[in-house]
């Protein structure tokens, strides 16, 4: 009898651990938004990438991507040049986003996020990624001063960029 129970239960798969899930990514969009004394600004960088985000996986549970800072476009050459100067694009041409330990939380995901920009690494332990039909997206609220940068000031102080910035990133699914 014990042998029968062992074979019956021994081949059972535990149901309390969700299956690994692979999400194929084909495009990434990063947007930096903020305010200045003359209004709102929005700078974005969209690029093609072929990669996979593994959810709830022990095998490969890290997603890394490099972001070329010179590819950001603010819709206006002067603003784009100001952003590139502010983030020191000549000294730090790339930023890196590393998402790891990705776990489902309802229909969304919780993860660890490391964002390496200039020579600083910002670490977020329980970062929420929102899952929609066509993309996975997250939002970081931070300050230029968090990464030891000075917001741009132009025209003898008439135009000042506020310290607060929002970074939205979207990982588009295949």
Per-region residue spans from a language model:
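Bacterial N-terminal signal peptides
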Residues: 2-10
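Low-complexity, acidic/polar, glycine-enriched regions of mature
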Residues: 12-174
């Amino acid at each position: 009898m014990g042998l029968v129970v062992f074979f019956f239960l021994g081949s059972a798969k535990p149901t309390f651990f969700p299956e690994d899930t692979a999400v194929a990514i084909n495009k990434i969009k990063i947007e930096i938004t903020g305010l200045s004394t003359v209004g709102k600004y929005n700078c974005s960088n969209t690029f093609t990438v072929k990669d996979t985000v593994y959810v709830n996986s022990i095998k490969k549970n890290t997603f890394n991507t490099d972001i070329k800072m010179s590819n950001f476009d603010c819709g206006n050459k002067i603003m784009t040049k100001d952003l590139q100067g502010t983030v020191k694009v000549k000294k730090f041409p790339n930023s890196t986003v590393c998402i790891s330990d990705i776990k489902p939380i309802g229909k969304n995901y919780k993860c660890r996020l490391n964002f390496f920009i200039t020579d600083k690494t910002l670490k977020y332990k329980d970062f929420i990624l929102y899952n929609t039909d066509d993309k996975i997206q997250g939002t970081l609220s931070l300050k230029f001063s968090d990464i030891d940068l000075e917001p741009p000031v132009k025209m003898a102080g008439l135009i000042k960029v506020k310290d607060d910035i929002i970074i939205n990133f979207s990982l588009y699914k295949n």
